[in-house]
């Protein structure tokens, strides 16, 4: 499976244990940990030996500086980025906690992803000193459990950890944030981690037996390990499976779909407590790529891939809201939206690093007696995160975030209007001139089980003259053959 190897560490200082566990997690992680899926994607690897051994029980130890690591990363990208688009970077610099300003390595990774059109996955970092975090978290931790560099990279997908296994004596229970997993937010209060996945647990005596994740050692034996280093490749595997299924490869779309899956899976969790997003990010994506890429009949997922220019906006009037979700003059249903884009970045502005903002509104318009049309968005940003004042929106919301999440369960109904509309707006900081910005908007509308709202919406769009295409995947092509 290793198609290329670059060695920047002399053989006597090499330790392949960490990377072997990571690669085995990408390739066989579901099987090794009893996580059933019929999909068996197999991937090829470019193995970059860049970081020397740091464990004296294994052999001689050495270290590497940040600048040297940056030089290695760029050299590797020069050689491989045209064909290798997904990169796992399970590392963290413990003494560089993200305290509000961007780290040098985070900025560098953003540059690399823009320059070479690749997607990098970064671990959120581990708490490596006692006490570890309980759940709910103890207040005495302060900022000790904040993410560390380079987990603040805006372009990277940062991955935290939750427990797969638990016991009577475990520090946390299944699906709770692992006791070592560093939390957000990132710089400028951007949501970090982006997603979480299984990365292990510990007993109160700090034993991992039966609580860690299973992977392979350098001899092919099954062993247990813990850490966000091992939750990160699980997210990589899911992203790579989505990307692999795409007939037309699209990194931004794959990123949006991964995070949208996480958000829709975690909607109850994130509604329980607004602070949960600091630990879970947008949640945990589905194990199966087909679950992410396909819809059931009782829901419809629409993907919009477009550009918006400065000083203008995009609108889609007369959106066909499902008739089966309209009762007694009111709209019902469950709506989740994920907006993904790549804002202009400028490290000269510190906390105002992200220079452009895109917003989406999806809601009802009504024509007044004077003939004017009134429109109001009905699907808010995360609960209690959308404030009117700039400082609050930056601290508590997603105004300058490259990923935005909107969600509403319409249980009491919304008074019927003249129709539904989608509106996309873009603005920039200090009104600087910026080029058109690409974005991906994913909207899922869910109804009661057994109600075919998928056909209602798709037929409604076609009746209104909108061109719709199914997202073509390799699975569909295989089925046709």
Question: Where are the model-predicted features located?
Answer:
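Catalytic-core environment of secreted peptidases
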Residues: 1-6, 162-232
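Subtilisin-like serine protease catalytic core
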Residues: 1-65, 117, 152-155, 186-192, ...
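Substrate-binding/access-modulating region of protease and related hydrolase catalytic domains
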Residues: 52-153, 220-226, 230-232
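Structured lumen-facing ectodomains of secretory-pathway proteins
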Residues: 119-193, 208-209
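Short, small-residue alpha-helix embedded
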Residues: 231-245
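Secreted peptidase-domain scaffold signal
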Residues: 278-364
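Extended, solvent-exposed segments with strong compositional bias
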Residues: 295-296, 304, 370-414
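C-terminal edge strands of extracellular/lumenal beta-sandwich accessory domains
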Residues: 353-367, 410-481
């Amino acid at each position: 499976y290793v198609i290329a190897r670059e060695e920047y560490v002399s053989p006597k200082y090499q330790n392949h244990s960490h990377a072997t566990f990571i690669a085995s997690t990408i390739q066989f992680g579901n099987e090794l940990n009893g996580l059933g899926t019929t999909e068996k994607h197999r991937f090829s690897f470019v193995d970059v030996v860049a970081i020397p051994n740091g464990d004296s029980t294994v052999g001689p130890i050495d270290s590497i500086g940040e600048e040297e690591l940056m030089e290695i990363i760029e050299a590797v990208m020069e050689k491989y980025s045209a064909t290798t688009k997904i990169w796992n970077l399970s590392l963290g610099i413990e003494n560089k906690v993200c305290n509000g300003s961007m780290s040098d390595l985070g900025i560098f990774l953003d540059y690399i992803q823009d320059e070479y059109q690749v997607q990098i996955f970064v671990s959120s970092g581990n708490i490596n000193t006692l006490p570890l975090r309980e759940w709910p978290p103890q207040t005495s931790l302060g900022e000790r459990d904040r993410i560390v560099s380079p987990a603040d990279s805006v372009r990277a997908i940062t991955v935290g950890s939750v427990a797969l296994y638990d016991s009577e004596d475990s520090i946390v229970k299944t699906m709770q944030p692992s006791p070592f997993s560093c939390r957000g937010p990132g710089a400028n209060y951007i949501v970090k981690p982006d997603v979480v996945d299984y990365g292990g647990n510990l007993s109160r005596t700090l034993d991992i037996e039966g609580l860690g994740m299973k992977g392979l050692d350098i001899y092919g034996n099954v062993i247990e390990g813990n850490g966000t280093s091992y939750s990160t490749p699980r997210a990589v595997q899911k992203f790579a499976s989505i990307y692999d299924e795409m007939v037309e490869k699209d990194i931004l779309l794959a990123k949006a779909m991964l995070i949208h899956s996480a958000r829709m899976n975690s909607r109850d969790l994130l509604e329980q407590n607004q602070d949960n997003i600091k630990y879970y990010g947008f949640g945990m994506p589905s194990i199966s790529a087909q679950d992410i890429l396909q819809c059931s009949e009782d829901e419809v997922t629409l993907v919009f891939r477009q550009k918006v220019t400065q000083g203008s906006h995009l609108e889609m009037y007369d959106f066909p809201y499902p008739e089966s979700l309209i009762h007694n003059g009111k709209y019902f249903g469950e709506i989740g939206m994920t907006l993904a884009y790549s804002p202009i970045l400028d490290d000269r502005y510190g906390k105002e690093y992200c220079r452009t903002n895109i917003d989406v509104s999806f809601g009802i318009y009504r024509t007044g007696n004077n003939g004017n049309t009134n429109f109001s968005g009905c699907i808010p940003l995360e609960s209690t995160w959308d404030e009117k004042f700039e400082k609050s929106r930056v601290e508590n919301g997603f105004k300058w975030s490259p990923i935005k999440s909107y969600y509403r369960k319409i249980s009491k109904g919304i008074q019927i209007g003249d129709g539904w509309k989608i509106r996309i707006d873009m603005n920039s900081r200090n009104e600087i001139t910026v080029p058109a910005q690409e974005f991906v908007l994913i909207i899922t509308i869910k109804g009661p089980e057994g109600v075919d709202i998928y056909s209602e919406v798709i037929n409604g769009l076609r009746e209104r003259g909108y061109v719709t295409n199914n997202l073509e995947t390799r699975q569909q092509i295989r089925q046709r053959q």
